[in-house]
C-alpha cells in the first residue's frame, strides 16, 4: 500500500491527472498514429447504459492493461496494422516463468506503433513472452523505461521544452 500510494503521490505532485473508474474502449487515430483514447465511465459500461464515450487526445498512449493487453488488441484488430512485434500482431503471453518473465518485461517495453507504448505484463503479452510471479521489480523498471521512451519520443519531436510543461500532459486512467 505504501509503495503504490507513494507512486501515485509522486505522479500527481509532478502534475499527472488520474481518472478513476474509467474504461478505455478504443483509441483515436490521427496521421497514422495513436493520438488518444476513447473512454467511458466503468459503471456506464457495467450497467449497459447508452452513453456516448469521451475522447482524450494525447501525444502518447501507454498500454499497461496487463495480461490481456486490451488496448493493443483493439488497435491491431480494428485498424489492420502491423505492430512492432515478431508477428506484427498481439502474440499473447506464455505460461509462468518467473525469471524469464521478470527480465523480458523490461526488454519488451517499447513503442509498438507510433504513439502507442507498452509496459508491464502487457509488454510480455504483446510480445509472446512469459508471465511472471508475484515479483514487481520488473514491473516498476518497465514503467520507468516506458516513461523514458515516451520522454525521448517527445524530445525527438521537439515537444515540451521543459519537464514542468511536460508533466501537465500526463493523464493516468485506472479502471
For each feature predicted by the language model, list its residue ranges:
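Residues forming the flavin
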Residues: 1-175
